[in-house]
Every structure is written in C-alpha cells, then in structure tokens.
From Swiss-Prot:
Pfam families reported in the protein's UniProt record: dsrm, Ribonucleas_3_3
UniProt keywords, alphabetically: Cytoplasm, Endonuclease, Hydrolase, Magnesium, Metal-binding, mRNA processing, Nuclease, RNA-binding, rRNA processing, rRNA-binding, tRNA processing
Protein task: Digests double-stranded RNA. Involved in the processing of primary rRNA transcript to yield the immediate precursors to the large and small rRNAs (23S and 16S). Processes some mRNAs, and tRNAs when they are encoded in the rRNA operon. Processes pre-crRNA and tracrRNA of type II CRISPR loci if present in the organism.
A GO term, aspect molecular function: rRNA binding
Major place of residence: cytoplasm
Protein name (Swiss-Prot/TrEMBL): Ribonuclease 3
InterPro entries tied to this protein: dsRBD_dom, RNase_III, RNase_III_dom, RNase_III_sf
Length: 230
C-alpha cells in the first residue's frame, strides 16, 4: 500500500509526482542500500547556493564575511533539524532495526531535510526547488537578528588565522568511527603541514569533531603568538 503523504505534501508546500523519490529521501542507510545519502549530497549543495543568493539579494550592504557567517548559521545542523521537526519529518523517517529511536537525532533530521531538497529538485527543476526553499526560510530570515551573528565557527577562524599569516589551510581526515549508527563517535585529525602541528578531537559527527580539532589548533597557534588579525 502506498503510504499517505498528502499531509506531508501540504506541510512542505510541494507535491511529488514521483513519490518514490520522497520515500528514498526519508530512508536511512540502516534500512536499505537505496537510501537518502546521494540525495542529501545533492540537497546540501542546492541549499547552500539558494541561501547564499537570498542573503546576497536581501542584505546588499553586508560584507562577504558577515554573509558567510549568516549562511553558516542558516544551513547548519541545529537549524535544519529544527526545520525538519517543524515539518514533522521525524514522523516519516524510515529507519532500520539498528537505528530505532533515532527519528529525532539531529544528524538524521539534518540529512533528511537536505535529502528532501535533492528529491524535490529531481522531481521538478531548479526554479521550483528554489521557490520551495525560499518559502521555508522566509520566517527564519525575517526574524534574523544580525547582531547575534558575530562569532565565527572554529574552522573559519582557523582558516583566517592561517591565511593572514601566509600559511596553507589545514587538512582534516577521519581516523576512526566508533559505535552504532545512532551513537557514532568520530575521531578527526587536523594537520598543518606548514607548522608541523597535528591535533585530534572527537565528536558525534564529522563536522563537530572537525570544529573541536580546529579549536585545539587555534589554542596552539595562540600560544605561538599567531592570532586572528582584526
């Protein structure tokens, strides 16, 4: 029997012509090889571009650095997870037995949100998915407090410190992934070849582990007298 998705279509503001794309966007890898991972990859790129364009047009007087900070805030995990919960995507996510209980996990919600975007694009066209994304983000952008968007994330801050001092960017690599799918712990190594500095950090996602590793490297650079130039 075909699942009843009319309620979800109404929430999303989009009705799929090929509902199997939606099913795949909602399916975690623990369930089947035909899962949302490729759609997530596509949706992530589309979302980043659309939000960048919206911010460019909406805030013509903001500098590139500020625009980047705002975009980072709008496309990061917690924002996407909250939007996914608002859309009640957690009620539709398809998980395998090993992932049961993971419907409200931030990483899964974030991935499904991006996969939905990829699925809408393949089901329609770029103009359509852009319109859908803009409608989703209107209330978010309209309530933005630009003064609250001040702090760079650690990776961005580290990048600026290194570039300002004529040094190459660090290399990030995953060393280990431990635990079950819904309780994974990533160990990431950050390496600065120019300075011969190597640090490691753990996190519940690759992104979080990389941010922690970047923060560790910033602390080492600070001890060596390398700081971000204002």
């Amino acid at each position: 029997m075909v699942p009843e998705y009319s309620r979800l279509y109404k929430i999303l503001g989009y009705s799929f012509k090929n509902y199997t794309l939606l099913v795949r966007a909602l399916t975690h890898r623990s369930k089947t090889k035909k899962n949302y991972e490729r759609l997530e990859f596509l949706g992530d790129s589309i979302l980043g571009f659309v939000i960048a364009e919206v911010l460019y047009m909406e805030f013509p007087d903001l500098a590139e650095g500020k625009l980047s900070q705002i975009r980072s805030k709008l496309v990061k995990g917690v924002t996407l997870a909250n939007l996914a919960l608002n859309f009640k995507l957690d009620e539709y996510i398809i998980l395998g037995a090993s992932e049961q209980g993971g419907h409200k996990r931030e990483k899964i919600l974030e991935d499904v949100f991006e996969a939905i975007i990829g699925a809408i694009y393949l089901d329609s066209d770029f103009a359509t998915v852009k319109k859908v994304i803009v409608n989703w983000y209107k209330p978010v952008i309209s309530t933005l407090n630009l003064d609250d968007v001040k702090v760079k994330d650690s990776k961005s801050k580290l990048q600026e410190i290194l570039l300002q001092n004529g040094l190459s960017l660090p290399e990030y690599s995953i060393e280990t992934i431990d635990g079950k799918d819904h309780e994974q712990e990533f160990t990431v190594k950050a390496l600065s070849n120019d300075l011969n500095i190597e640090v490691r950090a753990k996190g519940t996602s690759r992104k979080k582990a990389e941010q922690k590793a970047a923060e560790k490297m910033i602390q080492i650079l600070s001890q060596q007298g390398l700081h971000e130039k204002k």
